Amino acid sequence: MLTRKQNELLLFIHNRIKETGVSPSFDEMKGALQLASKSGVHRLITALEERGFIRRLAHRARALEVLKLPESAAAHETPAIPKGDLGANVVRGNFAKPEPDARENTVDIPMLGRIAAGVPISAIQHETDRFPVPADMVMGGEHFGLEVKGDSMIEAGIMDGDTVLIRRCQSAETGDIVVALIDDEEATLKRLRKKGGSVALEAANPEYETRIFPPDRVKVQGRLVGLIRRYH
């Protein structure tokens, strides 16, 4: 049984995808349901996902798929929810262990431990494992993976437990999501903003404050180029 707000949000998402092929943004969902904050939208989406009504897909920030509707709403649906093209913002993912022939188009990437999307944790660890990714995701440069710990980047579509694919680099453009090393001891995943003579590390969750540092305290370790989410 869904609450009234959960039901309203589910139908709003479903109708928007049917009309435009694109999932609504957090701002649009907040406005449609007249919620006070985006964190309220996140809680509703999490509840719908836990109940099996929607799922969040990898690679894109605005990537929601409606799996089913409440019986009262589904009875009026003709045709049924499409299972084919989900729109330009959705990439279907299949992260099961690939068959031998499928691995011909994959590349093994080192897993370097966990990265904080929240309060910074200890600096990046040594290689703990390797995992396959599509070769076209890592064309050029050196790449590595990190498991996300925390919820400070949820509005960028990055959730606790996701694996982020990072291209190693020492600089980034303002607005890029980066792995930043603070004072050579704390690693965190944040959006980089260059403000005058300072560097801002910006969360994608209103519950976290932007942190501002002089440039010599922050070293860019890499830039986000992909994301993998596994469904169990």
From Swiss-Prot:
InterPro entries reported in the protein's UniProt record: LexA, LexA-like, LexA/Signal_pep-like_sf, LexA_DNA-bd_dom, LexA_repressor, Peptidase_S24_LexA, Peptidase_S24_S26A/B/C, WH-like_DNA-bd_sf
The keyword Metal-binding is assigned to this record: no
Enzyme Commission number: 3.4.21.88
Catalytic activity line of the entry: Hydrolysis of Ala-|-Gly bond in repressor LexA
Gene Ontology molecular function: any one: serine-type endopeptidase activity
Pfam families: LexA_DNA_bind, Peptidase_S24
Keywords: Autocatalytic cleavage, DNA damage, DNA repair, DNA replication, DNA-binding, Hydrolase, Repressor, SOS response, Transcription, Transcription regulation
Active site per UniProt: S152 (for autocatalytic cleavage activity), K190 (for autocatalytic cleavage activity)
DNA-binding annotation, residue ranges on this chain: 26-46
Disulfide bond annotation, renumbered to this chain: none
One GO process term, biological-process aspect: negative regulation of DNA-templated transcription
Top EC class of this enzyme: hydrolase
Site (Cleavage): A117, G118
Job description of the protein: Represses a number of genes involved in the response to DNA damage (SOS response), including recA and lexA. In the presence of single-stranded DNA, RecA interacts with LexA causing an autocatalytic cleavage which disrupts the DNA-binding part of LexA, leading to derepression of the SOS regulon and eventually DNA repair.
Assembly, per entry: Homodimer.
PANTHER family, per database record: LEXA REPRESSOR, LEXA REPRESSOR-RELATED
Protein family per UniProt: Belongs to the peptidase S24 family.
Protein name per its UniProtKB record: LexA repressor
Gene name in the database record: lexA
